[in-house]
């Protein structure tokens, strides 16, 4: 039975990890995967 709420309810769509999920804009990526592919999908880092 899948979890319906809580931290383990969602997983990274790229690696399957359950921790530190970025859900904004429907990304559903963990923070590590987001950092790897952010430039490819159009995110820029400003200082």
UniProtKB/Swiss-Prot annotation:
Keywords attached to this entry: Metal-binding, Ribonucleoprotein, Ribosomal protein, RNA-binding, rRNA-binding, Zinc
GO cellular component: cytosolic small ribosomal subunit
GO biological process assignments: cytoplasmic translation
Cofactor(s) required, per the database record: Zn(2+)
Gene3D superfamilies: 30s Ribosomal Protein S14, Chain N
GO MF entry, a single one: rRNA binding
Binding site for Zn(2+): 12, 15, 30, 33
Its job: Binds 16S rRNA, required for the assembly of 30S particles.
Protein name in the entry: Small ribosomal subunit protein uS14
Organism (species): Methanosphaera stadtmanae (strain ATCC 43021 / DSM 3091 / JCM 11832 / MCB-3)
Primary gene name: rps14
């Amino acid at each position: 039975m899948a979890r319906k709420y809580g931290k383990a309810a969602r997983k990274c769509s790229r690696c399957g990890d359950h921790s530190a999920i970025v859900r904004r804009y429907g990304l559903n990526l963990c923070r590590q995967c987001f950092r790897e592919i952010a430039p490819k999908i159009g995110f820029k880092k400003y200082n």
